[in-house]
Amino acid sequence: MSITQERKSALIAEHARGKTDTGSPEVQVAILTTRIANLTEHFKTHKKDNHSRRGLLKMVSQRRRLLDYVKNKDVARYQAIIEKLGLRR
């Protein structure tokens, strides 16, 4: 269910705003999106795993808050990250 360190490093490198950037909202949203996708696949076979479902809802809420923050700060960055990650917002 969790993502590997190599995958996380690749996401950071792909979405980082600078050379040493690891915590910008873009990076956080990308990591959360990958984790959400992994959990969604998990729920296709484990429909009654309500404990993990609560974690999924928490991640979705966190991603929504981060996207709202980026949207309020810079709409162009918001549009870019939505386009890059293929989110429907």
Swiss-Prot record:
Database matches in PROSITE patterns: RIBOSOMAL_S15
InterPro entries: Ribosomal_uS15, Ribosomal_uS15_bac-type, uS15_NS1_RNA-bd_sf
Any one of the GO BP annotations: translation
Database matches in Pfam families: Ribosomal_S15 (PF00312)
Compositional bias ranges of the Basic and acidic residues kind: 1-20
Record key words, sorted: Ribonucleoprotein, Ribosomal protein, RNA-binding, rRNA-binding
GO CC term (a single one): cytosolic small ribosomal subunit
Start and end residues of each stretch annotated as Disordered: 1-24
Xref: SUPFAM superfamilies: S15/NS1 RNA-binding domain
One MF term in the entry's GO annotations: structural constituent of ribosome
Biological function: One of the primary rRNA binding proteins, it binds directly to 16S rRNA where it helps nucleate assembly of the platform of the 30S subunit by binding and bridging several RNA helices of the 16S rRNA.
HAMAP family: Ribosomal_uS15_B (MF_01343_B)
Subunit text: Part of the 30S ribosomal subunit. Forms a bridge to the 50S subunit in the 70S ribosome, contacting the 23S rRNA.
Family classification: Belongs to the universal ribosomal protein uS15 family.
PANTHER family tied to this protein: RIBOSOMAL PROTEIN S15, BACTERIAL AND ORGANELLAR (PTHR23321), SMALL RIBOSOMAL SUBUNIT PROTEIN US15M (PTHR23321:SF26)
Full protein name: Small ribosomal subunit protein uS15
Species, as recorded: Maricaulis maris (strain MCS10) (Caulobacter maris)
